[in-house]
Amino acid sequence: MFSHLLKPAARSAGLLGHVNRRYLATVHTNTAREIPKPSRKPTPISLENATFTIKNGPIFSGKSFGAKANISGEAVFTTSLVGYPESMTDPSYRGQILVFTQPLIGNYGVPSSARDEHGLLRYFESPNIQASGIVVQDYALKHSHWTAVESLAQWCAREGVPAISGVDTREVVTYLREQGSSLARITVGEEYDADEDEAYIDPEAINLVRRVSTKAPFHVSSSLGDMHVALIDCGVKENILRSLVSRGASVTCFPFDYPIHKVAHHFDGVFISNGPGDPTHCTSTVYNLRKLFETSQLPVMGICMGHQLIALAAGAKTIKLKYGNRAHNIPALDLTTGKCHITSQNHGYAVDPTTLTSEWKEYFTNLNDQSNEGLIHASRPIFSAQFHPEAKGGPMDSSYLFDKYIQNVQRYKDHQSSFSEKSNKPSPLLVDLLSKERVGVHPAQPDFEMHVPGRVEQVDVGGPVAPPYQPITAAA
């Protein structure tokens, strides 16, 4: 059936009987990084061997269909049936090898990098693949969808991301479920000593948020309203920005360690985004949020990593889950209404609700493992969700949380405008920010580096800040 796709050497070696959808191909790289023209032709097959090795665990052999690169990271799994382009570009997956439980991946190809009326990516959650590598059981040689412009194999090769097929992902997930998320490695076309510790780099030991956060403030305008929200970018998804601007809030995004409490008075609300890794690495963000809570009455909302950072700023603690929650169908109970919502989730840490002070209450709880899924302040307009109400992909059951936040922001803005002495003239800071172009996040690298790239320096807010933040230069 697939004999016309095999290399001559493979055909003469009698390998045809062993070839099916799971044995995938090496793709030609697009050195100019241009999106190719739409094509439904099957990707040529290469029988290059690849290995997926779990540290101190099983070794799986398969076939490479992505970049020829060796990487290591934390092996995690998602049970989502669809949405692999969104998942792979989600900054929360930075440093992780993503195992898909859905047996057939790649059947609808990869869409273009088209942008919507707000200048946001329509089909991706960031400009580049953020996962270190992917593991699938079967890869579809043929893809078909009206938005597709290239195959999953071509995309992975162009982005420098290794991918392996022909792996029994059921066995992988069973192991990870019982043993917990583990360090792992993908190797393409060569052998190595899997017992060497240096073959595995632990991304949890790195401040991953620093790698995916914007390097300088940028602005996304909304023509649908006059609210203005400051967003702390810990690795924000495009659909979070879209969920805010489509509701009439212009958004100014700041680096994760920006001293937001020093500029909060310029805004009508503060939002803390999702992000990858261990939240305890973000010590300066926690410090800045704590100062914000002490000096401001602004409405605040956090999602995923933002939820955890709010909890840490409030004095609570976080815990690492055994294998995390990564799916589009996880039930979360709203403790204020008793209603259950099906939610999209992607996190490996959770807030320990037993460490909350009396000012904070649980908002949501996970009905699968009883972990905390949200917080709400007893008297102030501050709340958070561990899951993703913006979905992309996933159900939209909880999208009303954005409506609730926008209502809080509008109420605060209306209250502030009732004071005649409040000036409506834009501050020099905001005038400066409106002229800034967005600085994209760095794409995932084939091998994880301990080196942290330098930050672009822009706006000086002055005054003492929490280490390790380094003030940025320019007039405020």
Curated annotation (Swiss-Prot):
Residues 1-24 form a transit peptide. Pathway: Amino-acid biosynthesis; L-arginine biosynthesis; carbamoyl phosphate from bicarbonate: step 1/1. It comes from the Eukaryota. It is an enzyme of class 6 (ligase). The active site is at C304, H388, E390. Its EC number is 6.3.5.5. It catalyses: hydrogencarbonate + L-glutamine + 2 ATP + H2O = carbamoyl phosphate + L-glutamate + 2 ADP + phosphate + 2 H(+). SMART domains: CPSase_sm_chain (SM01097). GO terms for biological process: 'de novo' pyrimidine nucleobase biosynthetic process; glutamine metabolic process; L-arginine biosynthetic process; pyrimidine nucleotide biosynthetic process. NCBIfam families: CPSaseIIsmall, PRK12838.1. This is Carbamoyl phosphate synthase arginine-specific small chain. It comes from Phaeosphaeria nodorum (strain SN15 / ATCC MYA-4574 / FGSC 10173).
